[in-house]
Amino acid sequence: MFSKLKKTWYADDFSYFIRNFGVFTLIFSTMTLIILQVMHSSLYTSVDDKLHGLSENPQAVIQLAINRATEEIKDLENARADASKVEIKPNVSSNTEVILFDKDFTQLLSGNRFLGLDKIKLEKKELGHIYQIQVFNSYGQEEIYRVILMETNISSVSTNIKYAAVLINTSQLEQASQKHEQLIVVVMASFWILSLLASLYLARVSVRPLLESMQKQQSFVENASHELRTPLAVLQNRLETLFRKPEATIMDVSESIASSLEEVRNMRFLTTSLLNLARRDDGIKPELAEVPTSFFNTTFTNYEMIASENNRVFRFENRIHRTIVTDQLLLKQLMTILFDNAVKYTEEDGEIDFLISATDRNLYLLVSDNGIGISTEDKKKIFDRFYRVDKARTRQKGGFGLGLSLAKQIVDALKGTVTVKDNKPKGTIFEVKIAIQTPSKKKK
């Protein structure tokens, strides 16, 4: 655990760890204090209620003391006669003791002397208040009592009894309370230690998406800068060549101009792709609309013309014979990316097949070619931004490794899946499944 703490101290998620651990510490500390406070406040509730009840009936308290007495004291007979008239029975237990005092707070009856109660001293200022005292018995053991002092107000007889003190032994309650407090502290401390590990885990989990996002952003900027560096270098080289030939005609430098224009087109395509990706990062929200079957026929006709211009054989099959509901713009962009990718990675006179079909809930796109193919290792990375299977070939074809990344985002937005397979004997197959709706279920 200490090694984890040491690593966290120097990690990027240390601030998250401190924040989480601080919250857990505050929670467990507050819970511990509240529980202990509740225990203390409720520990003597029943004892204090009993003492208050006895203080309201001093005659019954005197009767209790007399009944427990083992010897007679001065003026006790008159007090016995008067107290015997009490009909209300006091609510007492075996751990309750009564001490009688005269007006000078001299003990008249102290009960069991073994308990050491004959040595306690009370004062009039404590009258009517419940408080706690510690008494040592004959064996030197400490006993804890809750005490209330009351005035007897016995005036019908001649007696020296002026005050009575009721004591209830709470030593067992104190011992039980201490054990419970220790148990609570141990349990809370254990959970506090567990919260340390929980804070480590939460810090790692909380910061992971941020770190991944920062790494992707850093990689994105580095790759974009790298892609822009090449066309800028070409432009600089061509322009410097033009400056070195001030007497040359346009025909003489037409190759440099054409190359520069090509690089400008590449940069414009790159910046457009980057802008599209940035917009998609904010979240693609499909706008559903009815897409007629003629849309696919028109799109395939355009693809056929492009394939012919690039000396490719393009075959298509439209198995959709009804109107579907999806985002037409995103669907066309997805189809174009897959078609353009097949054209780039297929040699001249190569073959490209595009099949589209649908069920009640899903639309299926299948694009296959007999091009150079994609290795198993590359299949895991082709949807990453700026990843290219053959960088030299892709660069020559004007690609930047952004198309398939954007296609994956579109597929995810349309609640679909895309898989890549090998075509036999060579080439690649892209299979796409996206969710669609029927016109009757179109969302308004």
Swiss-Prot record:
Keyword terms: ATP-binding, Cell membrane, Competence, Kinase, Membrane, Nucleotide-binding, Phosphoprotein, Transferase, Transmembrane, Transmembrane helix, Two-component regulatory system
Membrane topology: Multi-pass membrane protein
Domain Histidine kinase, first and last residues per copy: 223-438
Residues recorded as bearing Phosphohistidine in the entry: 226
GO MF terms held by the record: ATP binding; phosphoprotein phosphatase activity; phosphorelay sensor kinase activity
Domain of life: Bacteria
Principal place of residence: membrane
Pfam families, sorted: HATPase_c, HisKA
Localization (cell): Cell membrane
Transmembrane domains' residue ranges: 21-41, 183-203
EC code: 2.7.13.3
Biological process per Gene Ontology, one example term: establishment of competence for transformation
Identification of the protein by name: Sensor protein CiaH
